[in-house]
A protein has these predicted regions:
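Active-site HxH/HxHxD metal-binding segment of metal-dependent hydrolases
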Residues: 83-158
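Core dinuclear metal-dependent hydrolase active-site scaffold
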Residues: 36-38, 59-60, 152-175
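Sec-dependent N-terminal signal peptides
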Residues: 8-17
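Short, Lys/Arg-enriched N-terminal segments with co-localized hydrophobic residues
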Residues: 1-4
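Conserved beta-strand hairpin/beta-sheet module of binuclear metal-dependent hydrolase folds
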Residues: 33-87
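Structural recognition of the beta-strand scaffold that forms the well-ordered cores
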Residues: 59, 67-70, 93-97, 113-114, ...
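Boundary at the C-terminal end of the N-terminal hydrophobic targeting segment
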Residues: 22-28
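Solvent-exposed loop/turn segments at secondary-structure junctions
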Residues: 51-54, 66, 73-76, 99-103, ...
Length: 175
């Protein structure tokens, strides 16, 4: 699976929370909070869910669309996040679901992207067991509906979505 993607998301979330980037703006929502950062050629939106898992969802806003990295899992966050996305006024081009395969059921199969190997991993004992634990703990508050399909991207390679380059690389063998 793609450990590098997971590390990037973790680092972005950590830096966003610490203010290292120097937030260009912040939007307080009812449940979560969004911090925005102007980067070279795109804008980064980090939605801090403030849910029981402390998750963050990242949106890369390119010139002609949005790419979402890891959807929120809780239904109330999904609803709030959808409203935020609508306010950006650009279409969602891709939803990259690396370690968060929940929350993507409302997107078309050609919008949902899983990195090579993630589909099998999500059905396995480790990830599948974690999701079963979430179901037991949070019940109907989380969205674990099956998605209709997805595009799979190789663990090595580049994709350009919304005018922004996304590089994928294979993670550690233990990942």
């Amino acid at each position: 699976i793609v450990n590098a993607m997971k590390k990037i998301l973790w680092i972005v979330s950590l830096l966003a929370g610490s203010g290292v980037f120097g937030a260009q703006g912040a939007a307080a929502l009812l449940k979560g909070e969004v911090k925005t950062y102007d980067m070279d050629g795109f804008r980064l939106h980090v939605y801090l869910t403030q849910d029981a898992l402390g998750d963050a969802t990242t949106v890369v806003e390119g010139r002609d669309g949005l790419v979402i990295l890891e959807m929120p899992l809780f239904k109330e966050n999904l609803k709030e996040f959808a409203g935020y996305l609508k306010g950006l006024g650009k279409p969602v081009v891709k939803v990259v679901a690396d370690y968060h395969v929940g929350g993507v059921a409302d997107y078309a199969p050609d919008q949902v992207v899983l990195v090579e190997g993630m589909s099998e991993f999500a059905k396995g004992a480790v990830y599948g067991g974690m999701l079963e634990g979430f179901k037991a703990a949070f019940g109907d508050a989380i969205d674990l509906r099956e998605h209709a399909g997805h595009e799979e991207v190789p663990a090595e390679g580049r994709r350009i979505w919304a005018g922004v380059a996304f590089d994928f690389s294979r993670g550690a063998s233990s990942d």
